[in-house]
């Protein structure tokens, strides 16, 4: 019994320590992403506005979600609806990420399908509407349990409880997590995005193979689009790789019962680690990001003067 207690304590301490480290990396990395887009005029395009939206969601994970996840892991005694609201916040920014990724995929699709009309279709007003819709959907999906789909209104045991030890499973219904949050608002968008990127790659490949024009500009355009699409598909792949294990754990919990705490912790940490991955991907895969990262490092970290950025489009 004492050995189990010691192992659980060690697991809790390790989990909290890793959460803090991931949170700090996520905040610093994604603040850099926003800084890069602000500094580099060539990155101030529709796609990168959605990337900024994704970065804001990842910053929120570092600032809000991880501290709240730590509080929930400690099982602090608080009011039921306070605990429920904290768990809902954990979900809002997950869905903000998936909605931002969906917006990015749709934008790249329009870019290659409507080459000539793209700028007329993606007006500033429509971009802001799309961003607002992404966040509105995220808040509505994440806050749904506050309107009744929770353990208090559906469980006899919790109905008369005012204060409780705040645990995710104490307030959040697993049928909501599995059928609504995962199947409807994570899995279906992921499948749609994979289909979009497959079509993007198919269109670009056809355009490059057709060689219908002798213009080097056309070939260069689709070459850049192919590289950008590959980079953004990698971001999508990492999101799926990071979040699907935790969603599968939730499915196992709902259909077959509890999983070991250490497995749950690993799933949570992997999902949260996704928030610090994207800045690394951008640095390695998108040339303009790498150049601006280096500019920031030279100018602000080692106080070395650097040439200003050009405004050419990547």
Curated annotation (Swiss-Prot):
Residues annotated as transmembrane: 15-37, 49-72, 85-106, 127-148, 178-198, 232-255, 262-284
PANTHER family according to UniProt: ADENOSINE RECEPTOR A3, OLFACTORY RECEPTOR AND ADENOSINE RECEPTOR
Pfam families, alphabetized: 7tm_1
An annotated GO BP: G protein-coupled adenosine receptor signaling pathway
Protein name as it appears in the record: Adenosine receptor A3
Lipid moiety-binding residues (S-palmitoyl cysteine): 303
Key word Cytoplasm present: no
Sites where a glycan is attached: 4, 12, 160
Subcellular location: Cell membrane
Membrane topology, Cytoplasmic segments: 38-48, 107-126, 199-231, 285-314
Positions on the Extracellular side per record topology: 1-14, 73-84, 149-177, 256-261
InterPro entries, A to Z: Adeno_A3_rcpt (IPR000466), Adenosn_rcpt (IPR001634), GPCR_Rhodpsn (IPR000276), GPCR_Rhodpsn_7TM (IPR017452)
Keywords: Cell membrane, Disulfide bond, G-protein coupled receptor, Glycoprotein, Lipoprotein, Membrane, Palmitate, Receptor, Transducer, Transmembrane, Transmembrane helix
A Gene Ontology cellular-component term: synapse
Similarity field: Belongs to the G-protein coupled receptor 1 family.
Name of encoding gene: ADORA3
Topology versus the membrane: Multi-pass membrane protein
Intrachain S-S bonds: 83-166
Organism name: Canis lupus familiaris
Entry keyword Chaperone: no
Main location group: membrane
Single GO MF annotation: G protein-coupled adenosine receptor activity
Function summary: Receptor for adenosine. The activity of this receptor is mediated by G proteins which inhibits adenylyl cyclase.
